[in-house]
From Swiss-Prot:
<dbReference type="GO" id="GO:0006223">
    <property type="term" value="P:uracil salvage"/>
</dbReference>
<dbReference type="InterPro" id="IPR034332">
    <property type="entry name" value="Upp_B"/>
</dbReference>
<dbReference type="InterPro" id="IPR000836">
    <property type="entry name" value="PRibTrfase_dom"/>
</dbReference>
<dbReference type="InterPro" id="IPR029057">
    <property type="entry name" value="PRTase-like"/>
</dbReference>
<dbReference type="GO" id="GO:0004845">
    <property type="term" value="F:uracil phosphoribosyltransferase activity"/>
</dbReference>
<keyword id="KW-0021">Allosteric enzyme</keyword>
<feature type="binding site">
    <location>
        <position position="84"/>
    </location>
    <ligand>
        <name>5-phospho-alpha-D-ribose 1-diphosphate</name>
    </ligand>
</feature>
<comment type="pathway">
    <text>Pyrimidine metabolism; UMP biosynthesis via salvage pathway; UMP from uracil: step 1/1.</text>
</comment>
<keyword id="KW-0328">Glycosyltransferase</keyword>
<dbReference type="GO" id="GO:0044206">
    <property type="term" value="P:UMP salvage"/>
</dbReference>
<feature type="binding site">
    <location>
        <position position="109"/>
    </location>
    <ligand>
        <name>5-phospho-alpha-D-ribose 1-diphosphate</name>
    </ligand>
</feature>
<feature type="binding site">
    <location>
        <position position="202"/>
    </location>
    <ligand>
        <name>uracil</name>
    </ligand>
</feature>
<dbReference type="InterPro" id="IPR050054">
    <property type="entry name" value="UPRTase/APRTase"/>
</dbReference>
<keyword id="KW-0342">GTP-binding</keyword>
<dbReference type="GO" id="GO:0000287">
    <property type="term" value="F:magnesium ion binding"/>
</dbReference>
<feature type="binding site">
    <location>
        <begin position="137"/>
        <end position="145"/>
    </location>
    <ligand>
        <name>5-phospho-alpha-D-ribose 1-diphosphate</name>
    </ligand>
</feature>
<dbReference type="Pfam" id="PF14681">
    <property type="entry name" value="UPRTase"/>
</dbReference>
Length: 216
């Protein structure tokens, strides 16, 4: 059976709330950044539900021995935010995966061609076998940036089945590209918006998430 891209839009009231705050053009940068951090937290929570491997063990309570299920300490976890806007999602995600290593990836989009160029690559030469990777990109618009990021990850022996992509807003254009190129991928997003404008921005979207986070 052929693989098929899995896209989840969690029906969580806190995700809906913080998305509404982030969408509002009157939200000041400090609150916008807070909203993005909360979206990073709750979308990571949803993404981790069937993704975190556990081991069965026993612990001693003050009264007796109890069975317990703990996150497998042998599994390597990695968070990769795509700069700049991906930084806003890191705090929330890292709060749930405190032992994860964080590797930064900087990609900037040419506003004329809409093609990305790489300006920062802190990825390792290779990822350890079995690495679980959380990829953070707030806006999946044309799909060009996320495709470039995935090319860099795949060249370093990451297993697409072990990637969870967290995005705040996604457009059908990007999802179609990802479906064609990486059907094993799993995506968690707060919303799938209808379309892109002639500048490649998602509509209604959030505007420029990086600019809004940092007040520039």
């Amino acid at each position: 059976m052929a693989s098929q891209l899995r896209v989840y839009v969690p029906e969580h009231p806190l995700i809906k709330h913080w998305l509404g705050v982030a969408r509002d053009e009157n939200t000041p940068p400090v609150l916008f950044k807070t909203a993005m951090g909360e979206l990073g937290r709750w979308l990571t929570y949803e993404a981790a539900r069937y993704w975190l491997p556990t081991v069965d063990t026993e612990v001693k309570t003050p009264l007796a021995i109890a069975k317990a299920s703990l996150i497998d300490p042998q599994t390597p976890f990695v968070i990769v935010p795509i700069l700049r806007a991906g930084l806003a999602l890191v705090e929330g995600a890292q709060g749930l995966l405190p032992l994860a290593k964080i590797y930064h990836l900087g990609l900037v989009r040419n506003e004329t061609t809409l093609e990305p160029s790489l300006y920062l690559n802190k990825l390792p030469e290779r990822f350890a076998p079995g690495t679980h990777l959380l990829l953070l990109d707030p806006m999946l618009a044309t799909g060009n940036t996320i495709m470039a990021a995935l090319d860099l990850l795949m060249a370093r022996d990451i297993d697409a089945n072990l990637i969870r992509l967290v995005s705040v807003v996604a457009a059908p254009t990007a999802l179609q590209k990802l479906s064609n190129a990486h059907p094993n991928l799993t995506i968690y997003t707060a919303m799938i918006d209808e379309q892109l404008n002639d500048r490649g921005y998602i509509v209604p979207g959030l505007g420029d998430a990086g600019d809004r986070c940092f007040g520039t």
